């Protein structure tokens, strides 16, 4: 059996810093794994962008990770998963692990059959999400809410400011009035707002995200690779955005001081 400190790195990308919530769970699940993370912060948020643009960016970012040795690519973004994972799987000869809003576990957790989903416009309008609802919502009522502005708050590491709290209250209020007892965080950025969201919705509402489940899936896909070793694996970070400006939010969200590298120009893209 191989030891993770000697294998190729696992590659992870997101529209920005939200995917760090998934990276954190992967590191917890596979502490000896070498990890490479790319934040496409020049183009965040993906939510309002078209599928073709997201597909181009996803191919570029996955290509960068493969060029740097990744043998598994994790799309730590619900919007990019919905728009680009089928194309990535057609284009790349390696495992691709994506995100999926936790509608299935939410249906099991709900006591009254009313589930709320907070996500981006891109995720909520995708065929993938529609298929997910068709599959799991026959016996429950699913209420959705797009959340413009929340991704940007997380990108700034503004996790509990008056502005962020006001947005969370605005987006959860109609779901609470409708009586949801289970709330799905359908965007990896929103996981960083979980303490605030739980404080706003109260203890009677169960909040669910899929980060830990995705990390377990990554370990399963890794197959014969051990999840432990003699030392912790390294983590390297890149961004298409302004690395100097993003360093402070990255350190705040990751929980430690790390180096942030700039993507080479050919991977940054020119226009939306």
Regions found by a protein language model. Give the residues of each.
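Non-catalytic structural scaffold of enzyme domains
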Residues: 1-272
